[in-house]
Amino acid sequence: MTDDDSETSASETQAQEESDLPVFQLCGLVEELSYGNSALKTETEMFEKYYNKLELKDQRPPRLSEIKITGAEIAQLRSRRKSKSRMGMERVMGLSVDQKLELVQKELEDTKDEIRHMRANAERDLQHHEAIIEEAEIRWTEVQKEVHDFEKDILKTISKKKGSILATQKVMKYIEDMNRRRDNMKDKLRLKNVSLKVQRKKLLLQLRQKEEVGEALHDVDFQQLKIENAQFLETIEARNQELIQMKLASGNTLQILNAYKRSSLLKTSRVVILQSKLHHAMQMSLNLTKEFLLRKELLEKIEKETLQAEEDRAKALALNKQLRKQLSEFRAPQVMIYIWEKIRNGDLEKTIRMWERKVEIAEMSLKGYRKAWNKMKTTNEQLQAISGPGK
């Protein structure tokens, strides 16, 4: 019987035995196998990690003779979940205890190195965050001081001139002076930083020259150089931090300046709106004044017309009174006298019309006589004119 047949029969026997076990024993067996699988998984990951390191170190695909973990080991790691009899058989083909100990020690050293790197990174991050917090506290103190100075120097002096152009100009001048001072400080720090870098380069050059000449440096000299280098690095870092703070302050100042510019533009627009409203109000006032004068003239005219109407009314009353008086004194004639006067008036009108016709007839006769006279006169003149040359 071959090995495969024996393994198959052993697995079938174990499966039959496991099927005969009760449920709680099966649960315990499952837990035990799960624990073993987790341990094997951890061990496999460790082996794979070590194998990957070897591959990176060799930079070439390893041969089967150079691999410490043989194919039998891989088969053994994959088949650990099989029967106990087969597990016992494969343990003989696995790694030795010394090999496993060596792998575990290397993994432990790598883990310690990673922990040291993580601790160093964490300390560096902690120092960075502490520096940021310290910088923020310093910046907050400076901002409070600047706000106090601004309120003391500017706000209290321009509170009574709110909205005026002089107040805006004063604020702009204050901000420009502050920016100028910060720029000067930034230039000074930059020059100091450049000088420190130049000094550091000189020291490095001297150190390189000494190494080239072959002078032996003692540990004390190296320690002194390290201390000086650390001091210079701290100074450079401090100058860089001050430069960063100045840049932040300059950026904040520019933001404040832009805010005041926007506020000034808003105030200027409000002033323009108020001026337009004032112009509109003045125009309306002029229109109202003109209308008031027109109404006043109209009122004076109405008063004059009222006085004239009063005078006319007085005259009309006087005339009415006079007419009433005449009417009261009027006496109508008797009827016969009135009829007689009426007949007489009619006769007189007839006589007048008759004489008017006679006058018209006489005028027509006169016109005829004048025409005949003129004709005779003309004829006589013609005759005289004709007879004159004959004499």
Swiss-Prot record:
Residues 1-21 are annotated as: Disordered. Residues 95-243, 294-369 form a coiled coil. GO terms for biological process: cilium assembly. Keywords: Cell projection, Cilium biogenesis/degradation, Coiled coil, Cytoplasm, Cytoskeleton. It comes from the Eukaryota. GO terms for cellular component: axoneme; centriolar satellite; ciliary basal body; protein-containing complex. It is found in: Cytoplasm, Cytoskeleton, Microtubule organizing center, Centrosome, Centriolar satellite; Cell projection, Cilium. InterPro entries: CC_domain-Cilium_Assoc, CCDC113/CCDC96_CC. It holds the Pfam family CCDC113_CCDC96_CC. Component of centriolar satellites contributing to primary cilium formation. In complex with CFAP263, acts as a regulator of ciliary beating that connects radial spoke 3 (RS3) to the inner dynein arm (IDA) and the nexin-dynein regulatory complex (N-DRC). The complex is positioned parallel to N-DRC and forms a connection between the arch at the base of RS3, the IDA tail and N-DRC. Forms a complex with CFAP184; the interaction is required for functional activity in cilia. Interacts with HAP1 and PCM1. Belongs to the CFAP263 family. This is Cilia- and flagella-associated protein 263. The lineage of its organism: Eukaryota, Metazoa, Chordata, Craniata, Vertebrata.
